[in-house]
Each structure stands twice: as structure tokens, then as C-alpha cells.
């Protein structure tokens, strides 16, 4: 926690799945719980997808085929199993790293902790490109353990509204996942006329393998 800490500000970047993970409480109560742990701001990782989408749309139109850089396990899988496709991995930082970089650039005293469902993100924040932007990664289970250690009963807390638009302005008004954000960015950049957009979403390693073949 960062109570009594005046040297830096602690930011929690939360994965979109946080709303379904803590099914026994409302999202606003979970956000309050995170703030009670000593975080100054709670920021949605989804904002990073909007930031990535604009540059990713151009890269997609240039290359004709692109795989997302969102999931570090998927990126590692392509590098090992399909090395010839390596050039088609998006060169952008993942949405989480992108929003974390933005936070660090706008607040030099920021420390960023990513909270998400997947341990693969722990490997991502060790990577050289990402290390400057993300200071730590914890899973939802670890977050729950922190709540328990502070005797925070989440379902009895008041709700805090997650209003990131006020921090980050209108640039992030779009939502609907990376595929929708890229589709919108193609239109905004005038690339939709010359490029046919056919996103494929895969759930799990088998679907990924089948799609890449």
C-alpha cells in the first residue's frame, strides 16, 4: 500500500475482465477497495486499446495481415511455433504497456501496477521494452488476498465510479475491444476504402493454431 507515501503516486491499471471476476460485488465497490489499498488512481487497460488502435490500423493496412500484441503468451507462441509469421506481430506495445507508458509520461512520479487475470502478463513486464512502464503485475487472486489481509469486505464498500474519460480526454471515448477500435481507426484514417478488414478472434491455443495455419 502507499498510505503515508508522498514520494510517488500509485496507479492501478485494471484488465476489462475485472468486472466479471469479482461477481460477489459491484465493480464500483472493487474500485473503492483498490483505492483503500493505497492506490491514487484506477485506470482501465481498455484505454490502451484505443491508443494502440490508431497506429495499429496503419500497420495493418501496410502489412495486409497482423496479429495482435495484446497477449504475451500468444506473442511467444508465434515466435516459437510460427517463426515465419514473426514479422506480422504488431510492433505496438500491448494496450496495458501503452496506457502505462502514457501514465508515466504524464506523471513522472507515477508507479504502475497492472491487475489482471493472467500470469503471462508477469512475464511481459520483465521484457526490456515494457520494463520502464510497468512496475509490478498482480493477479485477481493476489488482489483478493490483499483485500483479505486488510479485512476489506468489498461487497459492503461504497461504489466509486470508474470515470477515466475525465483523466484522459475524448481520445478514449471509443470502446468495444481492439478489433472495433482498429475498425474505427481505419475509417478515421481513410484506409477503409482501400483495405478489406477481416478480423479473426480466437479463444484458446487450439483456435489460435487453427487460424494461423
Which residues are covered by each model-predicted region?
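Iron-sulfur-associated redox domains of electron-transfer enzymes in respiratory
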Residues: 2-213
Amino acid at each position: 500500500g502507499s498510505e503515508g507515501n508522498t514520494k510517488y503516486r500509485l496507479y492501478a491499471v485494471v484488465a476489462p475482465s475485472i468486472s466479471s471476476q469479482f461477481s460477489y460485488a459491484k465493480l464500483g465497490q472493487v474500485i473503492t477497495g483498490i483505492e483503500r489499498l493505497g492506490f491514487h488512481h484506477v485506470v482501465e487497460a481498455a484505454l490502451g486499446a484505443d491508443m494502440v488502435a490508431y497506429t495499429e490500423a496503419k500497420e495493418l493496412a501496410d502489412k495486409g495481415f497482423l496479429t495482435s500484441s495484446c497477449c504475451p503468451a500468444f506473442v511467444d507462441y508465434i515466435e516459437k511455433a510460427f517463426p515465419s509469421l514473426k514479422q506480422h506481430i504488431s510492433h505496438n506495445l500491448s494496450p496495458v504497456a501503452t496506457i502505462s507508458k502514457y501514465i508515466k509520461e504524464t506523471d513522472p512520479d507515477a508507479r504502475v501496477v497492472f491487475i489482471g487475470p493472467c500470469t503471462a502478463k508477469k512475464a511481459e513486464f520483465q521484457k526490456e521494452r515494457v520494463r520502464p512502464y510497468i512496475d509490478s503485475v498482480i493477479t485477481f487472486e493476489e488482489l483478493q488476498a490483499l483485500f483479505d489481509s486488510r479485512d476489506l469486505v468489498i461487497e459492503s464498500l461504497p461504489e466509486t465510479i470508474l470515470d477515466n474519460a475525465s483523466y484522459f480526454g475524448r481520445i478514449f471515448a471509443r470502446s468495444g475491444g481492439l478489433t472495433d477500435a482498429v475498425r474505427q481507426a481505419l475509417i478515421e484514417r481513410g484506409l477503409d476504402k482501400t483495405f478489406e478488414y477481416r478480423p479473426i478472434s480466437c479463444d484458446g491455443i487450439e483456435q489460435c493454431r487453427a487460424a494461423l495455419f
